[in-house]
């Protein structure tokens, strides 16, 4: 399944709808859409990456509000994490895990400094992997994380995928879903990326009703 960051642009929304793409929503969007629910099926990101990019602390209050508003209808929810936090990030995520699971399936963000053994015992039908981290690390370890998720029957999602080449790498790693911003910004990118994601075995588990 393909996700793109939420947008209010009608042309892009309709292009996503026709192609069967979904939306990835996060706390910074709470005020932007004046309480309007997402127009397409969606998952929830915790917003930690956006806060990191803006140089501000993680918005715990905003994430909690997002959970209450949309959590029960989300495909899955990324558990709060600490960008570039390594194992400290995992400890932070574990403090939130039960709360997130009370709303929807949860994905634990894995990043530089983490190994499969750190999360393997947590994974299962309702707890999966959200592959973040630095670009080099993500590309280097993607297959390993895919194998770990597969061994536990867990969902495997890859973050920040905006090119056809990256989609092919997700296919090879056995990812069930990915997200990106390319389609959100430019609807003209959707046909090329959607054609690529329909090739091969990408998301076969989800499409078979896993």
Each language-model region and where it sits:
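Non-catalytic, usually N-terminal nucleic-acid engagement modules in DNA/RNA processing proteins
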Residues: 1-95, 192, 202-209
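Glycine-enriched alpha-helix->loop->beta-strand junction motifs that scaffold or abut catalytic
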Residues: 18-22, 38-40, 72-74, 101-104, ...
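Glycine-rich phosphate-binding active-site loops on the catalytic face of alpha/beta enzymes
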Residues: 29, 49, 133-135, 169-202
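Alpha-helix-loop-beta-strand connector modules within alpha/beta enzyme cores
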Residues: 41, 94-107, 140-163, 202-209
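Conserved, mostly hydrophobic/aromatic
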Residues: 45, 108, 170
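Catalytic cores of alpha/beta
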Residues: 57-61, 116-122, 155-156, 162-180
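Distinct, well-ordered alpha-helical segments
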Residues: 88-95, 115-124, 141-145
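His/Asp/Glu-enriched short active-site or ligand-binding loop at hydrolase and phosphoryl-transfer sites
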Residues: 126-139, 162, 179-182
């Amino acid at each position: 399944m393909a996700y793109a960051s939420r947008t209010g642009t009608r042309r892009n929304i309709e292009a996503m709808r026709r192609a069967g793409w979904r939306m990835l929503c996060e706390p910074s969007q709470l005020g932007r859409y004046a309480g309007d629910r997402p127009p397409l099926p969606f998952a929830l990101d915790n917003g930690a990456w956006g806060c990191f990019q803006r140089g501000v602390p993680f918005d715990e209050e905003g994430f909690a509000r997002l959970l209450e508003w949309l959590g029960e209808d989300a495909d899955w929810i990324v558990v709060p994490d600490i960008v570039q936090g390594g194992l400290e990030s995992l400890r932070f995520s574990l403090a939130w895990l039960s709360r997130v699971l009370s709303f929807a399936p949860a994905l634990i963000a894995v990043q530089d400094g983490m190994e499969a053994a750190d999360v393997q015992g947590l994974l299962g039908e309702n707890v999966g992997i959200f592959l973040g981290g630095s670009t080099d690390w993500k590309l280097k370890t993607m297959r390993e994380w895919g194998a770990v998720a597969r061994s536990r029957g867990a969902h495997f999602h890859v973050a920040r995928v905006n090119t056809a080449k990256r989609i092919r790498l997700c296919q090879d790693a056995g990812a069930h879903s990915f997200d990106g911003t390319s389609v959100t910004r430019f609807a003209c990118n959707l046909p090329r990326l959607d054609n690529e994601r329909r090739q091969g075995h990408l998301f076969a588990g989800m499409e078979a009703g896993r």
